[in-house]
A protein has these predicted regions:
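Catalytic palm active-site di-aspartate
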Residues: 1
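Domain-length cofactor-binding catalytic modules of enzymes
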Residues: 7, 11-182
């Protein structure tokens, strides 16, 4: 077992996680993360301005059946991922654990945005199609995997929207869930 008491279980969990983190840090020291940088992050003001323009548009596209709260994250870890060479490839792999699967669907939606040539109007113009394509993909996934006793398909909209050079936008039924989903 992990321990005879809740405290021993907690301490064992922390010990194992710390060992895993030490191992990972040792193996990745000095190496480019996510295939290195493909683009640079925009400055803080530009990131916030773009997120401020994108969020109400996305919310309008996905919130017809259920109101959504949004959250924007442009932390260093998020920017490292959304600016990386392997963003599309790794995002396409989908979630990494069952909890993520339940909260974030099978994968995020990578927004078509080029931080080297930021054209927010073109990005917004393409969002409806991107959202519809995501919904269609989710519905096809559900149909391929469902069983006779499966629950009805959940909301087919993406929860996580990754914007190169900008950050991550998440939407859920409330602010706390939107924040946790990232």
């Amino acid at each position: 077992t992990w321990g005879d008491t809740p405290k021993e279980c907690y301490e064992a969990t922390i010990r194992i996680i710390s060992r895993a983190m030490d191992w990972l840090n040792e193996k990745t020291a000095g190496k480019a993360v996510f295939g290195g940088a493909k683009s640079s992050a925009l400055d803080t003001g530009a990131r916030r301005e773009i997120a401020t323009k994108l969020m109400p548009v996305v919310r309008g596209l996905i919130g017809a059946d259920e109101k959504k709260a949004g959250h924007f994250d442009d932390s260093q870890a998020v920017l490292e991922f959304v600016c990386s060479n392997r963003l599309e490839e790794l995002a396409g792999l989908g979630t990494s654990c069952p909890d993520h699967f339940l909260r974030t669907k099978i994968r995020p939606l990578v927004v078509d945005f080029d931080p080297a040539k930021p054209d927010i109007d073109a990005t917004i113009a393409g969002l409806a199609q991107a959202v519809n394509d995501y919904r269609d993909g989710y519905a096809a996934y559900y149909e391929a995997c469902k069983h006779p006793d499966s629950p009805a398909m959940r909301d087919p909209n993406a929860v996580v929207y990754l914007v190169p050079g900008v950050g991550m936008i998440t939407f859920a039924k409330d602010k706390a869930t939107a924040r946790i989903s990232g």
